[in-house]
UniProtKB/Swiss-Prot annotation:
Binds the lower part of the 30S subunit head. Binds mRNA in the 70S ribosome, positioning it for translation. This is Small ribosomal subunit protein uS3. Residues 39-107 form the KH type-2 domain. GO terms for molecular function: mRNA binding; rRNA binding; structural constituent of ribosome. Part of the 30S ribosomal subunit. Forms a tight complex with proteins S10 and S14. Belongs to the universal ribosomal protein uS3 family. Coiled coil: none annotated. NCBIfam families: rpsC_bact. CDD domains: KH-II_30S_S3 (cd02412). Keywords: Ribonucleoprotein, Ribosomal protein, RNA-binding, rRNA-binding. GO terms for cellular component: cytosolic small ribosomal subunit. PANTHER family: 30S/40S RIBOSOMAL PROTEIN S3 (PTHR11760), SMALL RIBOSOMAL SUBUNIT PROTEIN US3C (PTHR11760:SF19).
Length: 226
């Protein structure tokens, strides 16, 4: 069953954290959940071509902290911070709490599963060969230190009448090992032949001991076995 379970959800609380961190009373839970959905939908729609990999949302009683992880922070911030002020003002419309917006850079976008999936999707839209896109992404990922990568593409590949699934794997992808740091993401490419689905698994090593971080107030991996 290891191959059928979402690797991120499978490891939540073990070596992965939640993208939304807050506590709410029963009457407020639904409202906060909808607010999170609207915030992420706005960022995905309006912050385009900026390499946004994920959006972290943390809440206190009267504040909402939104952290955007991106490989191109300059595109998100804009000239003299003009774009980030616009994003902050628009996000304030989705919640009654004060919004604090932070931008964090993704150092190695080639080893980030979501950014790799989006990159392949963009190449497929431009009619680049799916095999070339897959192999190029895998080579870049392994060259920058990943221990293994698996790429799966489904749909009318090459414009064929019958949809099929093709996948490639290099290195190790230990699906059942909970201490394995596996990044997983999905993306869709809207082509003239229909939607093509892309799934990415990236294995970065094994996480062993953990320690408490005073800075982030979270339990973080202490050592990753290379």
């Amino acid at each position: 069953m290891g191959q059928k379970v979402n690797p991120v959800g499978f490891r939540l609380g073990v070596n992965r954290g939640w993208d939304s961190v807050w506590y709410a009373k029963k009457k407020d839970f639904g409202n906060y959940l909808i607010e999170d959905f609207k915030i992420r939908a706005y960022i995905k729609k309006n912050v385009v071509n900026s390499g946004v990999s994920k959006v972290m949302i943390e809440r206190t009683s009267n504040k909402c902290f939104v952290t955007i992880y991106t490989s191109r922070p300059g595109f998100v911030i804009g000239k003299k911070g003009s774009d980030i002020d616009k994003i902050k003002n628009n996000l304030s419309k989705f919640t009654n709490n004060e919004v604090t917006l932070n931008i964090k850079e993704v150092k190695k976008p080639e080893t980030n599963a979501y950014l790799v999936a989006e990159n392949i999707a963009q190449q497929l839209v431009k009619r680049i060969s799916y095999r070339r896109a897959m192999k190029r992404a895998m080579q870049s990922c392994l060259r920058l230190g990943a221990k293994g990568i698996k790429v799966s593409i489904s749909g009318r590949l090459g414009g064929n009448e019958i949809a099929r699934t093709e996948w490639l794997r290099e290195g190790s992808i230990p699906s059942h090992t909970l201490r394995a740091d596996i990044d997983y993401a999905e993306a869709e490419a809207l082509t003239t032949f229909g939607i093509i689905g892309i799934k990415i698994w990236i294995y970065k090593g094994e996480v062993f001991a953990k320690e408490f971080s005073q800075e982030t107030n979270k339990i973080v991996p202490k050592e990753v076995k290379e």
